[in-house]
Amino acid sequence: MAAATVGVLLRLLLLPVVVVVSLLVGASRAANVTYDHRAVVIDGVRRVLVSGSIHYPRSTPDMWPGLIQKSKDGGLDVIETYVFWDIHEAVRGQYDFEGRKDLVRFVKAVADAGLYVHLRIGPYVCAEWNYGGFPVWLHFVPGIKFRTDNEAFKAEMQRFTEKVVDTMKGAGLYASQGGPIILSQIENEYGNIDSAYGAAGKAYMRWAAGMAVSLDTGVPWVMCQQSDAPDPLINTCNGFYCDQFTPNSKSKPKMWTENWSGWFLSFGGAVPYRPAEDLAFAVARFYQRGGTFQNYYMYHGGTNFGRSTGGPFIATSYDYDAPIDEYGMVRQPKWGHLRDVHKAIKLCEPALIAAEPSYSSLGQNTEATVYQTADNSICAAFLANVDAQSDKTVKFNGNTYKLPAWSVSILPDCKNVVLNTAQINSQVTTSEMRSLGSSIQDTDDSLITPELATAGWSYAIEPVGITKENALTKPGLMEQINTTADASDFLWYSTSIVVKGDEPYLNGSQSNLLVNSLGHVLQIYINGKLAGSAKGSASSSLISLQTPVTLVPGKNKIDLLSTTVGLSNYGAFFDLVGAGVTGPVKLSGPNGALNLSSTDWTYQIGLRGEDLHLYNPSEASPEWVSDNAYPTNQPLIWYKTKFTAPAGDDPVAIDFTGMGKGEAWVNGQSIGRYWPTNLAPQSGCVNSCNYRGAYSSNKCLKKCGQPSQTLYHVPRSFLQPGSNDLVLFEQFGGDPSMISFTTRQTSSICAHVSEMHPAQIDSWISPQQTSQTQGPALRLECPREGQVISNIKFASFGTPSGTCGNYNHGECSSSQALAVVQEACVGMTNCSVPVSSNNFGDPCSGVTKSLVVEAACS
């Protein structure tokens, strides 16, 4: 390689460092961000960028720096976030950018870490967020029609978009000002549904593009899932795979704004997850096929605090099986394996930005892509096996390569494989749930649970029916969202009838009451007592509840409590999707029926306890009763207790097992809706999900037949030294003595590396040079600062089987394995053990061997 070529290569390799340094310098110089057909271009240099979504209101300001640093350590260049209109302008014209809503602080935190920002303004965001991120007051603007060529909507959308842009400009946060924002997005996945709006939809889309460009941010704008996005906007791809995506112009780069790292959880659904091997395969295929910007949706999902969930029926946890979990801990092996993929991609960056891809077939379902400069000085290659069943052996550049099914091998020098997406070098972490001496294995959470059974509880009864002076009486049944404006989840429908005893809808004192509702949850009370309840689901929120009721001579009171569980957030005209009791409401018996749908109904928005702010411990209320014999398993009741925060700095959650459905507040801050009685279906889950073959949201599910969510995150910043307050509103009935606080702890770290694995990616210092001559190695590292490897629970070199926490020796096993690993690892914060017969002896010649280790840290 000529000296000049080496110099160019070194400059390209050092470019990310230069960018990081420039961002960390206080008032950084302005950057010129453009694009060409290959990549985003920053100050004249094409960049291969890896991005990840972190939504600022789904975590806390105290968590942001750690989340961002873990993202950087995982190999990200960019943090992507939506902007959530509803939290910033809950009341029209009154803006809020404080606390978890402090967008400027979040963007500055990203800049402080030396990363870029992609700001997705929308302002429609979907995001499984309540009403798609729109404030509900927008629905009541006269003459408005959402997301179409409607002047009222466009005026409001432009006003808020300008507010966001002006706020960013005012803080100097665009790259054109020396800030970290290099990209912005207008609208969101509109192309998925724009056909429903006809010509007006196309006109609106073009208007939105023009409006965005006119704001003069100095950085490119994108539209995702919009194949006809007009120039200069870049149309981008969202999905599980985007390697086959092509931009709508030869002048635009191939960009992937949402690579779904898992899937969201719904109340009543099983827990979805996406294997690390498949996610890595999708990423590598995208860069192989010409992509240069890829974003994980989500990289950290976080928590839907308060009433922010959309859906309806989106769960409070927005973990998303992301590389950083809901609590801010790295999820292994996903985080580590993707980190290795990113390092491999970055080793290829000089070739990816300097050359056009050249594709060739290596046989059935196998493909080589080469990026090579005209003078052959720089070359990188990707070898893919897209067969979902069979491993392949291929010839490339005179060498033989083995390609596992559904995998990509990355060769930064067109010769040496530094990574194969199906071969994980990263460690696995497991945990266990310990509760008062019992121990249950769990692959996600380790939770030490001090019970609240002996805590002193106060309670307050929430009255049934109408108690407020501002109640409204009208004939007929009113749609819920138009009535409440989403001020509360709850709307009471109340009426009464007089019974003589000979009515045709009676059978003695019995009758059947039928209530039809758009959802989402319905409870029927007759004369103050619960007579029946029903719920919809994520697939259909509709309710048709028929329940036997007992009526008494004289006046009978009928109270219906309709409850929303997040407003619709996706689809054409999603803003018009209603909720609440629509009728008929009908009493029926053997000789006739009485339709109550058109009678006078009295409506009350929200609960008495909400008006009294019972969730706020700083506001005293005479409603609270302190009694050791507090009621349990009773609907419509508030509970309150005091607790001391769990010691240490481990992430905290509350286990709501034993409760029904409700909402919880810690020191006055809502940690979200809880619903541990909503169970996943009994079927559809798999013990081990095969990563090979196309992934879908229902392919890999776990926890069938179990509650969708029992653990609810309490950020440490919500807690205070000494005494803390926990308040619950319980809608269905439960026993608060069964509630427990939990802290998340890792119990084991494991790794499984074979002789066929590439060497650790960290051993490569350039596309052509490795710092070591050794082959594959097994690496372990304790997850927390200050920990050391204290115990080797299992070690086997040969043909071991099983999974972390449940390994077994195979027929072939080295007798030296445990001693060798103990010598290398015990007492160390991290260790690396060569996977070679030279290290362990050869227990079975001619057989491909693996090293498996399970260790504990303390």
From Swiss-Prot:
Single biological process term from Gene Ontology: galactose catabolic process
The protein's enzyme class: hydrolase
GO molecular function: beta-galactosidase activity; carbohydrate binding
Active site: E189 (proton donor), E258 (nucleophile)
Domain of life (superkingdom): Eukaryota
Cellular compartments per GO CC: apoplast; plant-type cell wall; vacuole
SUEL-type lectin domain ranges (all copies): 772-858
Comment on pH dependence: Optimum pH is 3.5.
Function: Releases galactose by hydrolysis of plant cell wall galactose-containing polysaccharides such as galacto-xyloglucan, pectic galactan and galactan (in vitro).
Family: Belongs to the glycosyl hydrolase 35 family.
Protein name: Beta-galactosidase 6
Species this protein is from: Oryza sativa subsp. japonica
